[in-house]
Amino acid sequence: MKKWLCAAGLGLVLAASASVQAADKIAVVNVSSIFQQLPQRESVGKQLENEFKGRASELQSMENDLQGKMQKLQRDGSTMKASDRSKMEKDVMAQREQFSTKAQAFEQDNRRRQTEERNKILSRIQDAVKAVATKEGYDVVIDANAVAYVANAKDITADVLKQVK
């Protein structure tokens, strides 16, 4: 009786482990490669460049004006009246402060918009991964950059790239 119970238990364990191993169909996808190959990435970059072009040129002209005033102050500061030099120093300090504030706001806005657009593209890639995985019957899809080695997994990067384009 004991032998029969042991044999039945062992058989059950082997059958369960075999079905678990056979149930998972695994695929690998290289999301960063897809992201780099998308033509939308370049068009979004140009769109953002156009969106921030006005503010960038405004900052550039502010910087040039500020540098000109600083050079004039350095060059002519020793020959100016004390009151004029003091007034110009205060003006330069105020303009430098204003430039710094505007530059920080510009950088934050630019970074935020780039992140928004990148996330939109990544969301489209994620939707394409789900569509390909569902269509081809994969249970698990892993990013290729997150895995050191995979022996028995199909690379679906090309299929996902076709789906996104």
Curated annotation (Swiss-Prot):
Would I find Transmembrane helix among this entry's keywords? no
Annotated localization: Periplasm
- Keyword Nucleotide-binding applies: no
Record keywords:
Chaperone, Periplasm, Signal
- The protein's name: Chaperone protein Skp
GO terms (BP aspect): chaperone-mediated protein folding; protein stabilization
* Region Lipopolysaccharide binding: start-end pairs: 102-113
Which species is this record about? Answer: Pectobacterium atrosepticum (strain SCRI 1043 / ATCC BAA-672)
